Amino acid sequence: MEIRILKSESNYLELEIEGEDHTLGNLIAGTLRRISGVSFASYYQPHPLSDKIIVKILTDGSITPKDALLKAIENIRGMTSHYIDEIKGLTK
């Protein structure tokens, strides 16, 4: 995975994530939309055969797009940890 910043402003961030597809894009965008201060979050895959996605984040100024992205990643990490614990509990 390689991440490049395509555009960065005080309340807007556009990233290209190489080596990923809809699986990660949908998870990140959906999680971002639940964060207070995020006005818009989306992703798209420029071409069906490419293995890269473009993520766009727009905030209302109460949080920076970078902080919103970091918070989304922490939320995803927490969700996956919870699911791992639940699955481990099922196998006992």
Swiss-Prot record:
DNA-dependent RNA polymerase (RNAP) catalyzes the transcription of DNA into RNA using the four ribonucleoside triphosphates as substrates. GO terms for molecular function: DNA binding; DNA-directed RNA polymerase activity; protein dimerization activity. Its EC number is 2.7.7.6. GO terms for biological process: DNA-templated transcription. It is an enzyme of class 2 (transferase). InterPro entries: RBP11-like, RBP11-like_dimer, RNA_pol_Rpb11_13-16kDa_CS, Rpo11-like. It catalyses: RNA(n) + a ribonucleoside 5'-triphosphate = RNA(n+1) + diphosphate. Part of the 13-subunit RNA polymerase complex. PANTHER family: DNA-DIRECTED RNA POLYMERASE I,II,III, DNA-DIRECTED RNA POLYMERASES I AND III SUBUNIT RPAC2. This is DNA-directed RNA polymerase subunit Rpo11. It is found in: Cytoplasm. Keywords: Cytoplasm, DNA-directed RNA polymerase, Nucleotidyltransferase, Transcription, Transferase. The keyword Cell membrane does not apply. GO terms for cellular component: cytoplasm; DNA-directed RNA polymerase complex. Belongs to the archaeal Rpo11/eukaryotic RPB11/RPC19 RNA polymerase subunit family. The keyword Membrane does not apply. The lineage of its organism: Archaea, Thermoproteota, Thermoprotei, Sulfolobales, Sulfolobaceae. It comes from the Archaea. Its main location: cytoplasm. Coiled coil: none annotated.
